[in-house]
A protein has these predicted regions:
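Sequence/structural signature of beta-propeller modules
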Residues: 1-5, 308-336
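A short helix->beta-strand "capping" segment at the edge of beta-propeller domains
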Residues: 1-15, 51-53, 201-202, 268-272, ...
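Beta-rich, blade/repeat-based domains predominating
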Residues: 11-27, 56-79, 104-130, 140-146, ...
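Beta-propeller domains
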Residues: 28-54
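Short, solvent-exposed loop/turn segments at conserved positions within beta-propeller repeat blades
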Residues: 33-35, 80-85, 131-143, 182-185, ...
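A short loop-to-beta-strand structural motif that recurs across blades of beta-propeller domains
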Residues: 38-40, 86-88, 144-147, 186-188, ...
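Beta-propeller blade signature
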Residues: 89-94, 141-151, 323-324
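Short loop/turn segments immediately following beta-strands, especially the blade-tip
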Residues: 190-197, 239-244, 249-250, 310-320
Length: 336
């Protein structure tokens, strides 16, 4: 188990850095809710530069939750609005375009996470159809879904009936799509049966009291690492579903208060918008980075910097790890 004293922090002044993308250049990219919304670029020395939408206003901001990086320095933003969702592209010059705002003729609810499917398109998660989304913080709600957005063709719902769909990730083998269902406390997987096509849901494991699975990453051995909000936990999940707590920073009384509300189906924003801990600020995501992919970077909901620590194993490199981001670096004055 990681000692809290061994945690380092990088960056400062970030605004809701929920999701971290680590690039082989050493750059970290995180969502940023300042102004009209966009991302912040965090350099290896810790300095950060905001890259915000120039064609949106603070009255109509983008609120990125999950983000993905495209070749050429475009950043895809899963928009977590109060009522509306969608997927947007933020270009290096700060202009934006709508990638998707409806599926099957229906407007997208607030969206959670986006990731490449490995070549043919993107997967986008929607946690719940309920508005406000806090109505989905219940163990008996399963109206979340996953959209597949092909680079060529029409988007469609690839999986439905999920209990607060959060981060999804392709297994290193490419044969399975794993997904965290936060408020039914479950890590599930779907067999990839074709381009963007998924089989039936299978349960990898269920989590116990105090664990609310949010972030998801794989190491080179194919072991899953799950990040839990509220309890500030990182959980190692073996292939057989066996769980090991690797990191934890939580006040037992606070966790008991949240757990009681969850069990009574009375959980709401106050249970997520406050945290009682020593160092971590409601961690929500884990990204492997560093030159050897053995540094874990933790996204969070309530902090203004990124926590990091050394992992015992290297992470599986994601598709964005080596993409060309030269135009973005040049636009922000970071090109060497």
């Amino acid at each position: 188990m990681i000692d809290l004293a061994d945690i380092d922090f990088i960056g400062s002044g970030l605004k809701r850095p929920e999701c971290v993308l680590a690039h082989s250049s050493g750059l970290l990219i995180v969502p940023d809710w300042a102004g009209a919304g966009g991302v912040s670029l965090v350099a290896p020395h810790g300095g950060s530069i905001r890259h915000l939408a120039v064609d949106r206003s603070e009255n109509d901001p983008l609120r990125p939750n999950g983000i993905a990086l495209e070749s050429g320095g475009n950043v895809l933003l899963a928009h977590l609005g109060d009522e509306a969702g969608g997927l947007f592209r933020l270009r290096p010059d700060g202009t934006t375009e709508t990638v998707l705002d409806e599926v099957d003729g229906q407007k997208l609810p607030p969206c959670n996470f986006v990731i490449s499917d490995g070549g043919s398109g993107l997967f986008l998660t929607v946690s719940t159809r309920r508005v406000p989304r806090a109505l989905g913080y219940r163990k008996d709600v399963d109206d979340g879904f996953i959209v597949h957005i092909p680079y060529r063709g029409a988007p469609r719902i690839a999986a439905d009936g999920l209990g607060y769909t959060n981060e999804c990730m392709l297994h290193p083998s490419g044969r399975w799509l794993y997904v965290n269902e936060t408020f039914v406390r479950r890590l599930s997987r779907f067999k990839v049966t074709g381009r963007g096509k998924l089989g039936k849901r299978e349960t990898v494991c269920e989590f116990g009291a105090g664990i609310f699975p949010d972030g998801l990453a794989f190491d080179v051995a194919g072991t899953a690492w799950v990040t839990s909000i509220v309890s500030n936990c990182v959980v190692r999940v073996a292939a057989d579903g066996q769980q090991t707590i690797w990191l934890e920073d939580v006040d037992p009384g606070h966790l008991a208060w949240v757990e009681a509300a969850y069990q009574a189906n009375d959980m709401g924003r106050p249970h997520l918008d406050g945290v009682k801990s020593q160092r971590l600020r409601n961690i929500s995501n884990l990204a492997f980075g560093g030159a050897d992919l053995k540094t874990a970077y933790l996204g969070c909901l309530l902090g203004d910097s990124i926590a990091s620590f050394t992992m015992p194993v290297a992470g599986h490199p994601l598709p964005h790890w080596t993409v060309d981001i030269g135009p973005l670096l040049q636009a922000k004055g970071l090109a060497r």
